[in-house]
């Protein structure tokens, strides 16, 4: 965390927030949707204090996987009326959010966290030695996360201790599935769930392995 704080002091919060917003990052709280709000625009934002939704995180990771091209998540890909005529669907508004070289540099760092000995994301490595770009995360023992991507596929998983009152009902000193831990981290629940989904889905669609 200290390295992130040092980086933020050199780059400046405005530049960081601008880049994050371009990549689709925003606060999920209904009354504080702007990343520049007092709730979000603070030095700790660099270590993940903005309350982003799983969909937002998946979109940000997708932007990095697409060489910096950000597209608004659209659930509908095609609509036809009863006569078979196509109905216009919302645009994904795809645009170059960040420089491709920057996106590739971040992606390289994500992959190194997977492949390097002792890497914090080493448990995210997918089957068949498929090149994996992922990151685990934990926030005050209230949320466990894992997000990541391979070419043309991205996913984000979040486990919340108590959606109604996460501050007072944390993962601290909990027994889950017969396992007790004083503290729970992203690698314990979020990573296995993310990894199982990715492996199952990639196998089901016969996704080619692209490790370039």
Q: How does the language model describe each region?
A:
Residues 20-38, 126, 159, 165-172:
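Active-site-adjacent bridging/hinge elements
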Residues 1-27, 38-66, 112:
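Active-site-adjacent helix/loop patches that line small-molecule binding or acyl-intermediate pockets
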Residues 5, 51-212:
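A penicillin-recognizing enzyme superfamily signal
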């Amino acid at each position: 965390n200290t390295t992130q704080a040092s980086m933020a002091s050199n780059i400046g919060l405005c530049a960081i927030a601008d880049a994050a917003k371009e990549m689709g990052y925003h606060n999920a709280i209904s009354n504080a949707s702007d990343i520049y709000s007092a709730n979000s625009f603070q030095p700790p934002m660099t270590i993940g204090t903005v309350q982003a939704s799983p969909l937002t995180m998946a979109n940000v990771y997708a932007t990095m996987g697409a060489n910096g091209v950000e597209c608004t998540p659209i659930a509908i890909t095609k609509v036809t009326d009863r006569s078979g005529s196509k109905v216009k669907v919302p645009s994904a508004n795809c645009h170059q959010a960040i420089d491709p070289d920057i996106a590739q540099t971040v992606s390289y760092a994500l992959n190194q966290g997977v492949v390097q000995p002792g890497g914090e994301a080493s448990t995210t490595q997918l089957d068949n030695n498929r090149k994996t770009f992922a990151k685990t995360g934990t926030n005050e023992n209230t949320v466990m996360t894992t997000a990541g991507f391979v070419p043309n596929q991205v996913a984000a998983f979040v486990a919340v201790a108590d959606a109604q009152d996460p501050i007072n009902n944390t993962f601290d000193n909990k027994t889950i599935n017969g396992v007790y831990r004083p503290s729970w981290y992203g690698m314990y629940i979020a990573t296995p769930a993310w990894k199982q989904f990715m492996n199952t889905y990639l196998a089901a669609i016969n996704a080619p392995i692209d490790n370039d």
